[in-house]
């Protein structure tokens, strides 16, 4: 079957085998695990799942079932509640349908005909509202059929290696004011080995889930009385963040960035000038003060623009680099909130560079060097993608072309590889997205570098050039981590909670065997704190083994056990959990070791 053609590609458009008419411009897609093939297989598997659900729950009505990264889902309505325990039953029915080797066929009707055909299906009517006028394609397999643009595999025999992964709720059309539908997620591959490998990764991901580990490590919490998407940083989490912020602050200053702070609340007039009001309002929070509209900032750029405008600028001042740990708020629908990965309040390691056009390439390359240093420090591989003009954007095509080409030239001249995300740019300019790969080979979008000619024009920014003429600067928007929340969540999962020593909330656990050893433990803790190292003395009246297990569960990098011998000799029994070794050191030797651990990292 690996040599079977399941679809065709026409540039970036996929076409099913039924639509093939000997067009030599079409490229065959074979039954394998290529990106294009998996899209067709997973799309078809979503329909197979829907067919199985319809067979088991005849009253079921279906909304949409798209392919997503690593799988697919289907939103539908049933009378009874479907739980995780029901997935095996649905999978069994899917296997029966796959083994039946049903042909998958396509036919087309006018939109009016489809509307009449599904007159008694309100969810189909909802789908029709989202489809442009013209012919509507319907795919049919056995007794099941559904609206779909396709393409699909030609027969259900190709759908043998799948797994339904979870059940969730989803608002109709993502609208919190509409009804809640049932959503089942799944995945599929062309062979059993690839499926099993993926399922192993899923199981490992569950163990590494930052929400689970964050609770075990007492890093952060969420509270319904406070609200969804609003993380509460506990003491350990605050220490972790503080260490990360301190290291980044120093790294920015060494690279010539000036610390600034903009207000969190700005008049709506400022957001109207910037274009956020027209292009980003649905993602913002607004309020009234003294009968005037204000918006809570979703980005830090307007505040930095006003700081630029607070003084007369000369070409000699450029590039001018401002940075801040800016707290921003963005409206996210409750259904997409997910731990620290998707929140409504977060802090960006945000910077804006105001420079002359001739300095763009140099500044972009400097930022890329900064990115590389940071990613290597945390053990991340990464790749880059240039995101171009979206449908909803400000500025003319010429300005966008200049900005996009500036990014491409900077990457090309360094021989750096990158992909293109057509239409993925911010509304005010193209950007380079930094996508990191974690220990489970998952890709995460974190940092961005954006070239912006539009906001300097809208706010009439100026500098005086060498000929004493007024010129408009270019503005580079830049975040390397993206947000502290998201980056910390990714880092926790990447390290399975075993955070690098230099940012671990508690770096050393000090475990006195008995009450007689507490004073020595406190003495060590004080010495470590003077070095900027956080430790905790485990002084509860518990067994030695329980104290050590507690420290291990908290993922503390180093554990010191203190008994009579250690007190007498001014030594420590060290368990280095990262190096996976145990040894006895003098206290001075241990202090030297911790200093070396801290000095290993240079941003």
From Swiss-Prot:
Subcellular location: Cytoplasm
Pfam families: HGTP_anticodon, tRNA-synt_2b, tRNA_SAD
Entry protein name: Threonine--tRNA ligase
Cofactors named for this entry: Zn(2+)
Region feature Catalytic, mapped onto this chain: 209-500
Top-rank lineage group of the source organism: Bacteria
Protein task: Catalyzes the attachment of threonine to tRNA(Thr) in a two-step reaction: L-threonine is first activated by ATP to form Thr-AMP and then transferred to the acceptor end of tRNA(Thr). Also edits incorrectly charged L-seryl-tRNA(Thr).
CDD domains per record: ThrRS_anticodon, ThrRS_core
GO biological process, one term: threonyl-tRNA aminoacylation
Xref: PROSITE patterns: AA_TRNA_LIGASE_II (PS50862)
Keywords, sorted A to Z: Aminoacyl-tRNA synthetase, ATP-binding, Cytoplasm, Ligase, Metal-binding, Nucleotide-binding, Protein biosynthesis, RNA-binding, tRNA-binding, Zinc
Keyword Signal attached: no
Primary site of residence: cytoplasm
Its EC number(s): 6.1.1.3
A GO-annotated cellular component: cytosol
Family from the record: Belongs to the class-II aminoacyl-tRNA synthetase family.
Encoding gene, per UniProt annotation: thrS
GO molecular function: ATP binding; metal ion binding; threonine-tRNA ligase activity; tRNA binding
Reaction equation(s) it catalyzes: tRNA(Thr) + L-threonine + ATP = L-threonyl-tRNA(Thr) + AMP + diphosphate + H(+)
Disulfide pairings: none
């Amino acid at each position: 079957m690996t040599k079977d053609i399941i679809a065709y590609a026409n540039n970036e458009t996929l076409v099913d085998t039924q639509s093939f008419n000997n067009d030599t411009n079409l490229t065959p897609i074979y039954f394998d695990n290529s990106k294009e093939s998996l899209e067709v297989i997973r799309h078809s598997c979503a329909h197979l799942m829907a067919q199985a659900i319809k067979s088991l729950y005849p009253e079921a009505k279906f909304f949409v079932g798209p392919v997503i990264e690593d799988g697919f889902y289907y939103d539908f309505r049933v009378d009874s509640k479907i739980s995780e325990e029901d997935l095996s039953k649905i999978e069994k029915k899917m296997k029966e349908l796959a083994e039946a080797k049903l042909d998958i066929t396509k036919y087309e009707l006018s939109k009016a005909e489809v509307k009449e055909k599904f007159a008694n299906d309100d969810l189909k009517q909802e789908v029709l509202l989202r489809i442009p006028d013209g012919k509507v394609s319907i795919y049919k397999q056995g007794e099941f059929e559904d609206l779909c643009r396709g393409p699909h595999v030609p027969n259900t025999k190709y759908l043998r290696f799948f797994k339904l992964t979870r059940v969730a709720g989803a608002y109709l059309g993502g609208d919190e004011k509409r009804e809640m539908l049932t959503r089942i997620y799944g995945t599929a591959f062309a062979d059993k080995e690839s499926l099993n490998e993926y399922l192993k990764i899923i199981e490992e991901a569950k163990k590494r889930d930052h929400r689970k580990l964050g609770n075990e490590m007492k890093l952060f919490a969420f509270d319904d009385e406070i609200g969804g998407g609003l993380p509460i940083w506990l003491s350990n989490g605050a220490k972790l963040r503080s260490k990360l912020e301190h290291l980044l602050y120093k790294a920015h200053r060494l690279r010539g960035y000036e610390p600034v702070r903009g207000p969190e609340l700005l008049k709506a007039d400022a957001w109207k000038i910037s274009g956020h009001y027209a292009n980003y309002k649905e993602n913002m929070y607004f309020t009234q003060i003294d009968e005037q509209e204000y918006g809570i900032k979703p980005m830090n750029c307007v505040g930095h623009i006003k700081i630029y405008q607070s003084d007369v600028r000369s070409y000699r001042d450029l590039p001018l680099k401002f940075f801040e740990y800016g707290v921003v708020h963005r409206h996210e629908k409750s259904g997409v909130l997910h731990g620290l990965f998707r929140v409504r309040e977060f802090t960006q390691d945000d910077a804006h560079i105001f420079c002359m056009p001739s300095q763009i390439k140099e500044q972009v390359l400097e930022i890329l060097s900064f990115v590389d240093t940071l990613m290597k420090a945390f053990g991340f591989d990464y790749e880059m993608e240039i995101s171009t003009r979206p449908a909803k954007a400000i500025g003319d095509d010429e300005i966008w072309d200049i900005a996009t080409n500036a990014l491409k030239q900077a990457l090309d001249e360094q021989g750096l590889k990158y992909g293109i995300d057509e239409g993925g740019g911010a509304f005010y300019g193209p950007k380079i997205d930094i996508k990191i790969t974690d220990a489970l080979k998952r890709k995460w979008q974190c940092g961005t570098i954006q070239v912006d000619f539009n906001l300097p024009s809208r706010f009439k920014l100026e500098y005086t050039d060498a000929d004493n003429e007024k010129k408009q600067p270019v503005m580079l928007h830049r975040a390397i981590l993206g947000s502290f929340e998201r980056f910390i969540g990714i880092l926790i999962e990447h390290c399975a909670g075993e955070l690098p020593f230099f940012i671990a909330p508690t770096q050393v656990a000090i475990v006195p065997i008995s009450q007689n050893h507490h004073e020595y433990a406190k003495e060590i803790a004080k010495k470590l704190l003077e070095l900027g190292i956080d430790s905790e003395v485990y002084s509860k009246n518990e067994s030695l083994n329980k104290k050590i297990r507690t420290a291990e569960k908290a993922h503390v990098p180093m554990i010191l056990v203190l008994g009579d011998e250690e007190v007498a000799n001014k030594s420590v029994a060290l368990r280095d959990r990262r190096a996976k070794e145990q040894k006895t050191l003098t206290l001075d030797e241990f202090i030297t070791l911790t200093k070396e651990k801290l000095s290993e990292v240079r941003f």
